[in-house]
Each structure stands twice: as C-alpha cells, then as structure tokens.
UniProtKB/Swiss-Prot annotation:
Protein name: RNA-binding protein KhpB
Region annotation (Jag_N domain) ranges: 5-55
Residues covered by the R3H domain: 140-208
Gene that produces this protein: khpB
GO BP: any one term: peptidoglycan biosynthetic process
Assembly with partners or alone: Forms a complex with KhpA.
Domain KH: 58-135
C-alpha cells in the first residue's frame, strides 16, 4: 500500500502534488489533512504550507488478482490475469504459454485456485462476489461437455428407469447438469445432490 506526504500553498495544491507523485486519481486515495496551512500576515510572516498524507486505497479485486497471478506463475511460469467484474461475480481468466498446467485433472487444479482466490477476496469487508477462475477457456468447454453428458445419462435413465449417480463435482458443475435437465423430456427427469463436502455428487433419476 503506497503512501506519500505532500505539501503545497493550500490543501488542494498539496493533494494534487501527492496525486502526481503517486500517479493516481483522487478517488483512488484516502486523504488526511495534517496541516491546513496559513497564508501568514501580509502573506509573509507566519506563513505555513498545507500538508496532507495520501494513502492508496486497497482494491480487493485487484489484490485477489495479484494473489492469483503469484500462484499461477509459481505453477506455470509467466502468466497474465484479466478481470471481468459484474454486480455479483468476478471472473479471472489466466493466459500464458503453460496455462494448461493450471487446469489439472477434470479442472481440479483450477477449482483449487478458484477456492483460494475466493478466500483471498472474502478477506476484505463488503466483498461478497462469487469468483470464477478460468484458463484456456476450460470452463466453457467443460460446460458443453457436462451438458452433453447430462442429456446422454438422462436418456439412459428414461430407458432403464434406474437412477444414475455421478462422480463428486463442485456445486458450479452440478448446477450445469441440473439446469440442463430442468424440464427435460416433459419433466420426467429429476436431479438432486447427495453426500457431504468433497463427496457431494449429483443423482439423475426418473420421476415415478
């Protein structure tokens, strides 16, 4: 967190001097007036400069980005992280020559990075956005794969009338399957979750 103490003939001038030194705009800093300054008698005697302290505001989303980038580069070398923010979510997308190393088996490494980044963001008060971490557009490809799998398994359930239990997967992936099968085959299919923690999984069954 950068900070600077600056002086000027008045508070505004001191603030501008500090902003220029930090290379920031006024909305990016916290300003404390240490001395308001004094023009002095006839502008000469007793004259005192205004003194202010500027402290760079912490941007939780950018701090989480730096945290993620540090981990990504420790695993996959030089990496870039871009951020897309909406009202309820923050999406971090990692690119780099070895970004595929960050995915892991069925996205397990990516899911771990997502959890760590979510925890890093949650450290800051008032930050309640859902975090998504992606690399090599894995999330989109995975969504397409899961949707196709859901349809295939649902058709099997319709044919055999026997429930199918899927392997454990994160809530975001369970939701993809649930949404895909919502209303499928005239609402003959239902999905629900079972298990706890890492063993929580989805069941696809026929409505009797």
């Amino acid at each position: 967190m950068r900070n600077v103490t600056a002086a000027g003939r008045n508070v505004d001038e001191a603030v501008q001097s500090g902003l220029q030194e930090l290379g920031l705009t006024k909305d990016k800093v916290e300003i404390t007036v240490i001395e308001e300054g004094n023009k002095g008698f006839l502008g000469i005697f007793g004259k005192k400069p205004a003194i202010v302290k500027l402290v760079e505001k912490i941007d939780p989303i950018q701090q989480a980005k730096l945290y993620l980038q540090t981990i990504a580069e420790a695993i996959a070398g030089k990496s870039d992280v871009t951020v897309q923010e909406s009202k309820k979510t923050v999406r971090y997308h990692i690119t780099g020559e070895k970004a595929a190393l960050l995915i892991g088996k069925r996205g397990q490494t990516l899911n771990a990075l997502e959890t760590l980044t979510q925890l890093a963001l949650n450290r800051y008060p008032g930050q309640y956005k859902n975090v998504t971490v992606d690399a090599e557009n894995y999330r989109l490809k995975r969504k397409e794969t899961l949707s196709q799998l859901a349809i295939k398994l649902a058709d099997q359930v319709l044919k055999t009338k026997k429930s199918i239990q899927l392997e454990p997967m994160p809530s975001s992936e369970r939701k993809i399957i649930h949404d895909t099968l919502s209303g499928y085959a005239n609402h003959q299919i239902k999905t629900y979750s079972m298990g706890e923690g890492e063993n929580r999984h989805l069941v696809i069954s026929h409505k009797r």
